Amino acid sequence: MCELLGICFNKKVNVELSLNSFKHRSEDHPNGWGIAFYPDGFVRVIKEPIKMNEALLAECVRWTKIKSNIFIAHIRKASAGSESYVNTHPFVRKLEDKEIAFAHNGTLLGYEDLELDGYYPIGETDSEYVFCYLLSQIEKREIEWNKEGFDEMLDILLDINYYGAFNCLFSDGEYLFAYKDYRGRRELHFLKRKPPYGRIRLEDEDYIINLGDVKSVREEGFIIATNPLTNEDWKSFENGELMVFKNGEMIYSNKRLTDLELKILKILRESPHRVSLKKIIENLEYLSRNIRHDASVVRIGIRSLLDKGYIKQDSRDTVNWDDLEATFYTKPEKRVEIDKRLKGFRWRRNRIIMS
């Protein structure tokens, strides 16, 4: 099988440390390697149909210390398609004004039943074919990057998953999407990395490093990998789980409460009154030292909490739920569960501002 690596941080970071661990696994994945990143908002792709730990270009990527908020990397053990550049991940296509990079782990059969429209593969792989199908459907359904759009995107991924093992990563340079096979036929893990930073051990080599020596206290974000790369607190995706990350924060999951949602719940629980969307945004900006929250992201969190049944919009409101003046409170029957989930959930700043 192939292996995936995805990175999304709040600031541009150097990928050398994670790539160093990742490349050691290429001995069992000899059919190609590649990396996509967005140093200036536009995608760059470096890939070769050779073993990563024998690739001079891979060493150049490590030592030139390229920086980006988002990275997608892939090492290939071919199950479909020959060893060639066009069959090597990540694949890239333009979707309106977005440049989408995509990588897949798994094997699909009968996927040609999925009808393409406007996007077509150059190579021979199942991966590139279903990437084109994903883009065709996003364009056809006019999917937007919001909670409702992510739900629709999940439906498309589940349709693809019907044809076999399917884990994938894709990004437009602003959002990072990560999906795990609904039958759990491939592993996928994630790590939330945030300060204070300490010593860690790389899983694939006898090497210990103090992250505090190489990381800024302002850096935080998520790393996604097929298998854990370090001895840190990695967690498994749920089967059939889609996660979406932006600016170093998980902003959507169909299987769990995200940190964004927990922050919103904390604001609502610590207020004696209903809280407006505008005030929630202000509090998130005040309470979150490193992560920026624009209104579109906060609306994703609010919509998710409404759909998951944790909060309600006040019946006295005369505006739609997504209006800045809309007000919310936690459902009384959910407050015991919410308080349990918030136990131990801390921010650097603790005082909620309501005036």
Swiss-Prot record:
The keyword Iron does not apply. It holds the Pfam family GATase_4. It comes from the Archaea. InterPro entries: EgtC-like, GATase_2_dom, Ntn_hydrolases_N, WH-like_DNA-bd_sf. PROSITE patterns: GATASE_TYPE_2 (PS51278). It comes from Methanocaldococcus jannaschii (strain ATCC 43067 / DSM 2661 / JAL-1 / JCM 10045 / NBRC 100440). Residues 2-248 form the Glutamine amidotransferase type-2 domain. The keyword Magnesium does not apply. This is Uncharacterized protein MJ1515. The active site is at residue 2. Keywords: Glutamine amidotransferase.
